[in-house]
Amino acid sequence: MAAAMAAAAALATTIEPCAGADTCAALLGYTLYADMKVSEVAALFGADPRALLAANALDFASPGAANRILPAGLPLRVPTRCACSDGVRKSVAVRYSARPADTLSSVADVVFAGLASADQIRTANGLTAEDPDAPLDAGVKLVIPLPCVCFNSTDNNLPAVYLSYVVRVGDTVQSIAASHATTVTDISNVNAMGSPIVAPGDILAIPLSACASIFPNSASDYGLLVANGTYALTAGNCVQCSCGPGDLKLYCTPASLTALCSSMQCPNSNLMLGNVTAQSTSGGCNVSSCSYAGLVNGTIATSLSSGLQPTCPGPHQFPPLTATPIAVNQGSYLAPSPAPGSGEPGGDIPGFPGGSNVSPANGPSGSASRSTSANRPHQIVALILFVALYFQM
């Protein structure tokens, strides 16, 4: 009984050991605690407002997009860089300025929606073991350590970007897998789960199929990854890259969001970035295309490719963009475009012997870290008090 109670009181987070200074593209699953402007959410995580919209396949090109209001309870994917800190993968770039009535518990459980615990924030900032519900000094700057993993940006040897997902009340591994176009088996392997059982507050690493870039190491956007069914902005918002829905090949075009862009014309060609020409012949189809090759020394690099294909390609299909929502659909997160390949979402999981937190063979070398949830019983009270005070300010 004591062991069962201890297990119930612990919250699991998948961690990835690391060494070195390399980073990778990652996503944070964040649920809004109040109605917020796009720019406010972006500022909270130090992200670009348009990049935030692009990562969620929301219209990022419309005028005033950054000032659109997002409804409370809306789940979002926040793009971040996953670094190596203290021997484990985490995002450590976020800084939060405490406001009146903030506590460690309210910052962890409400403002950052459970992505970090009060204990983790306390440790990251060298604070004393004070009451997590004691008010913080207004204006104090806090480092917010946020969970992320890289796992070589692959899943089953295919390009993938990993989403840090906070388990919500009513979630099951099956429902999480189905809403993210992956499988129970895959989630269990990645998170080294002995059995497909989760509790609210657990943080899972969710592999999302993605389109990978092949830019040179000298490119400032080297390693760009775009999750299937979404977009990413790069080169100072001069270039937009998309993934899917027809295939998992990165496709980049001019973004037309700023006039301060270098030339996007392919060398020795009249083609501009994203242009494709096709000419049918008796032997097939001659296809020429101008592709994005990264931002090198502040200049947009392009690459011209030509070749004979069996048939001429049709018009490129882009992932659909949706308008900024005004109400929350309680169904799920953004549904990715269908990805090529086998594997049904929410499939059955083969039994893993034992209950260890060791990754199965051929799986990523992650592990499950459990931290005390002593602060979690205060979450509902903190939410009510914090939101009430928030609207009085």
Regions found by a protein language model. Give the residues of each.
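Extracellular LysM carbohydrate-binding repeats and other cell-envelope/extracellular binding modules
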Residues: 11-24, 48-91, 117-156, 185-223, ...
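Long, charge-rich, low-complexity intrinsically disordered regions
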Residues: 238-240, 258-261, 280, 285-290, ...
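Short alpha-helical segments in extracytoplasmic peptidoglycan/chitin-binding modules
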Residues: 38-53, 104-112, 118-122, 167, ...
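Extracellular/mature segments of secreted proteins
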Residues: 24-32, 91-94, 246-253, 259-263, ...
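C-terminal GPI-anchoring signal of eukaryotic secretory precursors
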Residues: 314-318, 322-379
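N-terminal signal peptide
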Residues: 2-23, 388-393
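Short, recurring structural edge motifs at helix starts
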Residues: 26-30, 35-41, 60-64, 92-97, ...
